[in-house]
Amino acid sequence: MPVTYCIDALGRIIRTTCSGPVNLAEVLEHFRALQEDPACTGQLDVLLNVCEAQVLPQASQLGAVSAAVGMIREKVQFEFCAIVASGDAMFGMMRMFEVFADKYFRAVRVFRETDKAESWLAAQRAAQDSAPRSHPRDT
């Protein structure tokens, strides 16, 4: 499977990996699967790893993916999103996606290394858990 995911309900995180020749239809199918997954509910962070993806998304496709994120907001409220992209071209495309998807997350950030992405998510979650519960994107 080019797009796989695992939901850690206790850790409140979706870990998604894109590998191989991922296409837009497969990414959109991933969001349909999340929509139907009973574990995909509440407030969740996202760790997206695209280091093994072999096809660079087109800029025009990033808007469609961002819209898919927005379509499942009634079911799940995404909090923080860390994206891991090691290659220069993919890193740049994910920075562009960061702009498209920013309105659906408290914060989105792109990293080159998984451990740095995980550390950032942990720091964001710790700060969030000690702060009031309103979502800044709701205002």
Name the predicted role of every residue range.
Residues 1-139:
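Amphipathic, Lys/Arg-enriched alpha-helical "gate/interface" segment within cytosolic domains
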